[in-house]
């Protein structure tokens, strides 16, 4: 009987040890999984900065080539998409700091991308129009922007996928 008790205790002991090992493995797996999730989450969130850097580099490349700021590019793109509008209406689409507003629009006029019009009945209102004479330059600018985006497409897509996975 002593031998049987010892054997039973041995089996129970092995079972207890197996349960303890299993619990240890589960706890460590949960910690590993949590750590992996945390690392993936942190990596994904950090990709916001990477993606923003890629976007900023596109605008820097455009600025260098075309001598236009981000706001000026966005104003042109908005005009091309929405058509002529007042400065006040444009403010809803493109945020330009008040201290840069006049200089931003005047630069686009100097570069001949846009022209301003004041309605006869309201001298306070200014309407901006795209200069249709620059249609070819518009196509070239859009191609330049498209190429700048395409050259970073894989990196930006990888960043975006990591962000979305968060």
From Swiss-Prot:
Gene3D superfamilies: Winged helix-like DNA-binding domain superfamily/Winged helix DNA-binding domain. Keywords: Activator, DNA-binding, Repressor, Transcription, Transcription regulation, Virulence. The keyword DNA-binding applies. SUPFAM superfamilies: Winged helix' DNA-binding domain. Residues 87-110 bind DNA. It comes from the Bacteria. One of its GO terms (molecular function) is DNA binding. Pfam families: Staph_reg_Sar_Rot. GO terms for biological process: response to stress. InterPro entries: HTH_MarR-typ, MarR/SlyA-like, Rot, SarA/Rot_dom, Transc_reg_Sar_Rot_HTH, WH-like_DNA-bd_sf, WH_DNA-bd_sf. Global regulator with both positive and negative effects that mediates modulation of several genes involved in virulence. Also, modulates the expression of genes not previously implicated in pathogenesis. Belongs to the rot family. This is HTH-type transcriptional regulator rot.
């Amino acid at each position: 009987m002593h031998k049987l008790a010892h054997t039973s205790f041995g089996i129970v002991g092995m079972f207890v040890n197996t349960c303890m090992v299993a619990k240890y493995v589960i706890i460590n797996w949960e910690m590993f999984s949590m750590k992996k999730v945390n690392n993936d989450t942190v990596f994904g969130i950090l990709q916001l900065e990477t993606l923003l850097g890629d976007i900023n580099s596109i605008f820097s490349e455009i600025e260098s080539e075309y001598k236009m700021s981000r706001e000026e590019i966005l104003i042109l793109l908005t005009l091309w998409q929405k058509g002529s509008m007042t400065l006040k209406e444009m403010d809803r689409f493109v945020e330009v700091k008040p201290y840069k507003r006049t200089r931003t629009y005047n630069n686009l006029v100097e570069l001949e991308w846009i022209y301003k019009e004041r309605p006869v009945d309201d001298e306070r209102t200014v309407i901006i129009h795209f200069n249709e004479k620059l249609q070819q330059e518009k196509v070239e600018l859009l191609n330049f922007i498209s190429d700048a985006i395409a050259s970073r497409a894989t990196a930006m897509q990888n960043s975006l996928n990591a962000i979305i996975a968060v």
